[in-house]
């Protein structure tokens, strides 16, 4: 997850010190002012994406869970879900994301949210927004959801409805967004980058401004579930889309709009941003590289900083990796499954850099990127450690002296050409 509005636009957001170790205004803070975070995979705790129902009232063309408006067997009961929340709270996970299917379809949605609140868990919900009326928005606000992420595929109602498989979905989703805004609930958009979305980016950013939306996350497509039937962006299309998002994000900040813009699920976005800032002579280029390296870079992602529990209680490295299961919460707590490295893939995810192959193995950014999204690589090639085909960096851009991710308390040297090396001595 790349916070474009912070790194490129210079926005100060509440999450900035936690994600990047410092406020954007701190050029080189002393060690005692930097955020203290675990520096090893074993000590990390994951954000847990919990697909606690597969049932959905829509049928989206890019749905990674292949959900439909039917009841599915084997989903966790209310008591089982509460036991999972108890374990996650004791384990110290930084956040739990209620997802689906459509999570608000579960009859016990609010009961589980209230239980999570009692445990002081940081809870987010990912929803299509069609079930959020004014009363639901007020209840969500009352239960102190940190954030409501609502899926949108286009600013054009016809295109959105076609993607969602239901006429009128756009208007119902927009009503849900407006109800959240009206009650003061933090709300944002979740958009998957497809050819339709990319051609619609100017209109989407106009909608963000017009509707006073707090946040927008642009997800690179992972071809899981029904998403495998969609054409992925070419590398040139990806670069154009990311450039457009960078530019629009900076413009929002310059005009005084405090909107968080993030890109998700392609970790080469970070190196690409730094290369662009370096090329443009941006005064914060060095600072941004340090911030990207903070917290171990993106190599601490799936299987370390991100985890997944599906509708039946199976545990996966992330929500796109349901083809591989490490255990089930009905048999063992998530905390035990997550720390068990007897499975070679789980062990590898926690120390992945030596296992990467192909262009990832020789890439100078691998300590920042971590080989990007392993699920996309494995779906495309059948090999866990193969290069991610979503990487749009050129061979020339990834060649050169490796960039070294140092501890947050260390200041590494910078080569004249912008490459970094570990401090000597």
Can you name each region flagged by the protein language model?
Residues 300-304:
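Short, small/polar residue-rich loop motifs at catalytic or cofactor-binding pockets
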């Amino acid at each position: 997850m790349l916070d474009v509005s912070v790194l490129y636009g210079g926005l100060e957001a509440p999450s900035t010190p936690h994600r990047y170790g410092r406020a954007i205004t701190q050029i080189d803070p002393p060690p005692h002012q930097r955020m203290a975070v675990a520096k090893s995979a074993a000590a990390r705790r994951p954000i847990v994406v919990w697909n606690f129902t597969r049932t959905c009232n829509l049928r989206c063309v890019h749905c990674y869970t292949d959900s439909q408006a039917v009841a599915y067997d084997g989903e966790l009961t209310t008591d089982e879900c509460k036991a999972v929340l108890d374990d996650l709270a004791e384990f110290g996970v930084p956040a739990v994301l209620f997802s689906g299917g459509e999570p608000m379809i579960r009859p016990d949605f609010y009961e589980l949210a209230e239980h999570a609140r009692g445990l002081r868990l940081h809870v987010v919900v990912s929803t299509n927004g069609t079930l959020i009326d004014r009363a639901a928005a007020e209840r969500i606000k009352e239960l102190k959801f940190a954030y409501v992420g609502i899926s949108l595929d286009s600013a054009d109602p016809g295109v959105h409805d076609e993607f969602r498989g239901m006429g009128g979905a756009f208007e119902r989703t927009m009503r849900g967004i407006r109800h959240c805004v009206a009650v003061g609930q933090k709300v944002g958009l979740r958009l998957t980058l497809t050819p339709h979305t990319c051609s619609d980016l100017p209109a989407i950013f106009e909608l963000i401004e017009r509707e006073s939306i707090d946040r927008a996350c642009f997800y690179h497509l992972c071809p899981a579930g029904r998403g495998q039937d969609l054409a992925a962006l070419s590398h040139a299309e990806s670069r154009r889309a990311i450039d457009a998002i960078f530019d629009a994000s900076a413009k929002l900040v310059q005009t005084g709009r405090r909107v968080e813009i993030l890109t998700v699920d392609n970790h080469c976005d970070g190196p690409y941003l730094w290369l662009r800032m370096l090329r443009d002579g941006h005064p914060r280029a060095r600072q941004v590289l340090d911030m990207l390296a903070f917290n171990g870079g993106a190599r601490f992602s799936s299987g370390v900083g991100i985890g997944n529990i599906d509708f039946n209680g199976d545990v996966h490295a992330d929500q796109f990796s349901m083809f591989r299961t490490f255990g089930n919460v009905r048999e063992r707590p998530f905390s035990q499954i997550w720390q068990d490295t007897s499975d070679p893939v789980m062990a590898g995810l926690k120390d992945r850099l030596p296992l990467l192959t192909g262009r990832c193995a020789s890439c100078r950014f691998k300590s920042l990127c971590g080989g990007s999204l392993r699920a996309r690589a494995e779906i495309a090639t059948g090999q866990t450690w193969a290069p991610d085909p979503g990487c749009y960096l050129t061979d020339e851009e990834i060649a050169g002296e490796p960039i070294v991710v140092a501890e947050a308390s260390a200041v590494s040297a910078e080569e004249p050409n912008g490459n970094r090396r570990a401090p000597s001595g």
